[in-house]
């Protein structure tokens, strides 16, 4: 069976919903294996903060026991050290420095220029939706014919030619 990202996502969602919905509480007869130092840290921190309603545990440190009697040790042997060797230092290596790297500067950014403008197509004159005005104003001396008329506009009714589109 191939493993893919979908399986990982589903497993993550199931695990997240299980963890977020309830806290898993182990019974005293159940257990998990954890390293001893980690278990000791957990035990100490639970005791320090009153975990499980128990009184804080006493620290697990005890002072070393006092010696029972004076221990006997033999007299120390005379210390012997070899004569000091003459100090030797290697001759200093000649100082070397790499040649300086040539100074580099990035090429200058090109000056900004506005993009070339795209010419608009010519305005159709006889289509249904056109950029040409369909109502032509007339001089204000023309009398209005009635209250509901076009007023200063002529009674010109534009004729539209809808382009014929043939399907293939």
Curated annotation (Swiss-Prot):
Q: Which residues form the propeptide?
A: 24-42, 155-168
Tell me where in this chain the VM domain is found: 117-154
Phenotypic consequence of gene deletion? Females are sterile.
**Tissue expression:** Follicle cells.
Question: Where is region (8 X 8 AA approximate repeats of P-[AS]-Y-S-A-P-A-[AS]) located?
Answer: 52-119
Q: Which residues form a coiled coil?
A: none
Q: Name one GO biological process term.
A: response to bacterium
- Range of residues in the leader sequence: 1-23
Print the domain comment field. The tetrapeptide (A-A-P-[AV]) repeats found throughout the protein are also present in many proteins constituting the protective envelope of other species. The C-terminal propeptide is removed between stage 9 and 12 of oogenesis. The C-terminal propeptide is non-essential for egg fertility.
Function, in words: Major early eggshell protein secreted by follicle cells into the perivitelline space and incorporated into the vitelline membrane. Involved in vitelline membrane biogenesis; forms a cross-linked network with other vitelline membrane components.
Question: Member of which family?
Answer: Belongs to the vitelline membrane protein family.
* Name of the protein in question: Vitelline membrane protein Vm26Ab
């Amino acid at each position: 069976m191939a493993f893919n990202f979908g399986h990982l996502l589903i497993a993550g969602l199931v695990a997240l919903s299980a963890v977020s919905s309830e806290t898993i509480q182990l019974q005293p007869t159940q257990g998990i294996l954890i390293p001893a130092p980690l278990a000791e840290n957990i035990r100490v921190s639970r005791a320090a903060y009153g975990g499980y309603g128990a009184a804080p545990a006493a620290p697990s440190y005890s002072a070393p026991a006092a010696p029972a009697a004076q221990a006997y040790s033999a007299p120390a042997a005379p210390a012997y050290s070899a004569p000091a060797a003459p100090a030797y230092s290697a001759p200093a290596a000649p100082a070397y420095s790499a040649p300086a790297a040539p100074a580099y500067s990035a090429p200058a950014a090109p000056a900004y220029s506005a993009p070339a403008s795209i010419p608009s197509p010519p305005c159709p004159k006889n289509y249904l939706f056109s950029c040409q005005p369909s109502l032509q104003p007339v001089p204000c001396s023309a009398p209005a014919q009635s209250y509901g008329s076009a007023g200063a506009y002529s009674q010109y009714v534009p004729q539209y030619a809808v382009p014929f589109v043939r399907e293939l």
